[in-house]
A protein has these predicted regions:
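Conserved acetyl-CoA-binding loop-helix of GNAT-fold acetyltransferases
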Residues: 154-157, 163-176, 199
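Conserved active-site alpha-helix within GNAT-family acetyltransferase domains
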Residues: 168, 180-182, 191-214
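Short hydrophobic/aromatic beta-strand element in the GNAT-like acyltransferase core
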Residues: 31, 39-45, 50-54, 76, ...
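Conserved beta-strand-loop-alpha-helix junction that forms the acyl-donor binding cleft
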Residues: 154-162, 186-195, 210-215, 219-224
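Conserved GNAT acetyl-CoA-binding A-motif
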Residues: 148-150, 177-190
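Active-site rim helix/loop that mediates acceptor-substrate recognition in acyltransferases
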Residues: 11-67
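Non-catalytic, usually N-terminal nucleic-acid engagement modules in DNA/RNA processing proteins
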Residues: 1
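Conserved acyl-donor/pantetheine-binding loop and adjacent beta-alpha core of acyl/acetyltransferases
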Residues: 55-162
Length: 226
């Protein structure tokens, strides 16, 4: 699955797959997010089964089938469901004769995360990684302040699987849920990926430039519920 990152200019610079520490960092990232209950990791696999299997092909579930290598990864995405902590003012105190417990206080605002170079592998450009992730995080927090949102944390489709509907399918997974919930959808898009989001209702609310790496911070309003 890590080979899917090879076409990303940002990952080539900051997490080169030739660097063992960078590869391990990406593996840890995937493992961490697979265990995150708020994360939805969607993996698209290339169908390598023949259209008409040979009569002698072993049935599914046999030892031969279990030992077969997994299908190649055609792309993957991580969607995060981000409900906004309640910031509504507390109701007025109840009359003294009311013995019911007081309502809980409103949730505290989410503390700002700070990204530093020591958080990233030295085999890549750790300073650039910290700058990009900080800009992306700050833009996310600003664009979705006070709003529930589905956040597309990552969508990666290798070049050989592009223009086959893989990216659109991975994108629709979260957009359908955002529309069902009546929530906004948010993504930090590269210049290469931006046309896909343009076609699916996203609008750029801000952009950050890091030399030849440009991040487009994009928001999509929910469509009518079905």
């Amino acid at each position: 699955m890590l080979d899917a990152f090879r076409d990303s200019l940002f990952h080539q610079r900051c997490f080169p797959t030739s660097d063992p520490a960078s590869r391990e960092s990406l593996v840890r990232w995937v493992d961490k997010n697979l265990a995150d209950p708020a994360s939805h990791m969607i993996i698209a696999e290339r169908d390598i089964s023949p259209a008409h299997p040979l009569r002698s092909a072993p049935p599914a579930g046999t030892v031969a089938d279990a030992d077969a290598p997994p299908p190649p990864v055609a792309g993957f995405a991580r969607w995060v469901r981000r409900p906004t902590p309640s910031t509504a003012p507390a109701p007025a105190p109840a009359p003294a004769r009311d013995s019911s417990p007081p309502p809980p206080p409103p949730a505290a605002p989410e503390p700002r995360m700070v990204f530093t170079p020591d958080m990233y592998p030295a085999g890549g450009d750790a300073t650039l990684a910290a700058r990009v992730f900080q800009a992306n995080y700050d833009a996310l927090m600003q664009a979705t302040s006070g709003r529930d949102a589905w956040f597309l944390s990552m969508l990666v489709v290798p070049r050989e699987h592009q223009r086959r509907g893989v990216g659109t399918a991975l994108l629709r997974y979260g957009l359908e849920r955002a529309d069902r919930d009546g929530w906004a959808a948010y993504v930090n898009a590269s210049s290469e990926g931006k046309p896909l989001y343009d076609k699916n209702g996203f609008a750029t609310v801000e952009r950050s430039e890091f030399g030849d790496i440009v991040e487009h911070h994009m928001l999509r309003e929910p469509e009518g519920k079905s």
